[in-house]
From Swiss-Prot:
Top-level lineage group: Bacteria
PANTHER family attached to this UniProt entry: ARGININOSUCCINATE LYASE (PTHR43814:SF1)
Protein species of origin: Rhizobium etli (strain ATCC 51251 / DSM 11541 / JCM 21823 / NBRC 15573 / CFN 42)
Protein name: Argininosuccinate lyase
Family (UniProt): Belongs to the lyase 1 family. Argininosuccinate lyase subfamily.
Keyword vocabulary terms for this entry: Amino-acid biosynthesis, Arginine biosynthesis, Cytoplasm, Lyase
Length: 467
């Protein structure tokens, strides 16, 4: 798709009747959006076909003119898709580029297409259609990522690993349980996507510049033809609204935050010091100087790209925050933010899905790490509550003394002699050792949503039925 950036002055703009001369070259440059909004060509043509069809149905244009318009628009669509369309910066945007080419192809009938329509509702339609399609794509990609985590969770429902708080060993959990935490996160992201699709499922076409139109149009007809639930209800709000774009960016930013947290864990877990996972060669790179290196670049790039998404959200919020109602040219700056964020999110989800599916999990290393750092200390405290009748705060204090003793002796809690434990509290018996293994700790956490393998499998079944 070629782009003509010739800087000669022109007075052939579609709005040029009121002007005696063409715009300055700098004005053309700052005013033009064709460099990025050409991405909307399919939505623009689809909307124009629906609009022309409605105009003919309502008797506003002739069926003959409608047929010429539709044929011409389909020709333009083929030209753009095949790379044989020359975009012109002097024509500003995708709407004017398409209309100018249509005039060349079919003559005066092209001038009837813009009846009862403004670029204000036209761009709102194109952009809304594009965001709706992108949300649908995001929903599918999140479903794939959730499926990847469900598979790993099922595979590792009993694989013990350390659970962390403050990145310090806390309690044993299973890797399957940890995977299911991300299923919950990305499930919420997908739910937000679905709600966003519902929110934007209204057709803006027919709002015209801001006040509606005096032509007897049928907005319900175009809404149905374009796959919307219904038309928007207020023409001023229709051309003012970019909530749908901001909501997309907010959803992308939240999903990006989840992806970034996952990326951070993968980066940490893949270090030799942790050694919990090993990324496949397909999602790793090497060093130009250090032959031994296998770097988690895919995870690091996911972590970085999510920062770009945050920037896009803040940029569009800032663009929109001071605008009076209806259309202002500031709103032209909305699309690049959304396009860039959408591309970043797609790449991040795709890369993370591949990493999760392909990575090798070192269950032996995880289990060994789970047994360090006194991870079963809470189990000792709980045993004292259940078996010795201590209040939890007293049990917490007794356990803290046991941890301090084990630390001073360089051993784990389960390795302390019974005499040492009884010296701390006389109610402790040899039965306490039954709860001090990581396997026993994990198996005991049977509360709803807990880390016990039986609970993890219930949650997997729940999500399998909904994915």
């Amino acid at each position: 798709m070629a782009e003509n950036n010739t800087d000669t002055k022109s007075s052939n703009q579609m709005w040029g009747g009121r002007f005696a001369s063409g715009p300055d070259a700098i004005m053309e440059e700052i005013n033009a959006s064709i460099g990025f909004d050409k991405k909307l060509f399919a939505q623009d043509i689809r909307g124009s076909i629906a609009h022309a069809t409605m105009l003919a149905h309502q008797g506003i244009i002739s069926s003959d003119d409608k047929d010429k318009i539709v044929h011409g628009l389909n020709t333009i669509l083929s030209e753009i898709e095949s790379g044989n369309f020359e975009f012109s910066r002097q024509l500003e945007d995708i709407h004017m580029n398409v209309e100018a080419r249509l005039a060349t192809l079919i003559g005066p009938a092209a001038g009837r297409l813009h009846t009862a329509r403004s670029r204000n509702d036209q761009v709102a339609l194109d952009f809304r259609l594009w965001v709706k399609e992108e949300l649908q794509k995001t929903e599918q990609m999140l479903t794939g990522l959730i499926a990847a985590f469900l598979d790993r969770a099922e595979e590792h429902a009993e694989s013990v690993m350390p659970g962390f708080t403050h990145l310090q060993t806390a309690q044993p959990v299973t890797f399957g349980h940890h995977c299911m935490a991300y299923v919950e996160m990305f499930g919420r992201d997908r739910s937000r996507v679905r709600h966003a699709i519902e929110h934007l499922d209204e057709s803006p076409i027919g709002a015209a510049a801001l006040a509606g139109t005096g032509y007897p149009i049928d907005r319900h007809m175009t809404a149905k033809a374009l796959g919307f639930r219904e038309p928007t209800r207020n023409s001023i709000d229709t051309v003012s609204d970019r909530d749908f774009a901001i909501e997309f960016l907010a959803i992308a930013a939240i999903a990006g935050m989840h992806l970034s947290r996952l990326a951070e864990e993968i980066v940490i877990w893949s270090t030799p010091q942790f050694g919990f996972v090993r990324l496949s060669d397909a999602f790793s790179t090497g060093s130009s100087i250090m032959p031994q290196k296998k770097n988690p670049d895919a995870a690091e790039l996911v972590r970085a790209k999510t920062g770009r998404i945050n920037g896009s959200l803040i940029a569009l919020l800032t663009i929109m925050k001071g605008l009076p109602l209806a259309y202002s040219k500031d709103m032209q700056e909305d699309k690049e933010q959304v396009f860039d964020a959408a591309e970043s999110l797609e790449l991040a989800i795709a890369a993370m899905t591949g990493m999760v599916r392909d990575m090798t999990v070192n269950t032996a290393r995880m289990k060994a790490a789970a047994g360090s750092g006194f991870s079963t200390a809470t189990d000792l405290a709980d045993w004292l509550v259940r078996e010795a009748g201590l209040p939890f705060r007293d049990a917490h204090h007794v356990t803290g003394r046991a941890v301090a003793l084990a630390e001073s002796k360089g051993c784990d809690l389960a390795e302390l002699p019974l005499s040492d434990l009884q010296a701390i509290h006389s109610a402790i018996t040899d039965k306490v050792y039954d709860v001090l293994t990581v396997e026993a700790s994990v198996a005991s956490r049977k509360s709803f949503g807990g880390t016990a393998p039986s609970e993890v499998r219930k949650q997997i079944a729940f999500w399998r039925a909904r994915n």
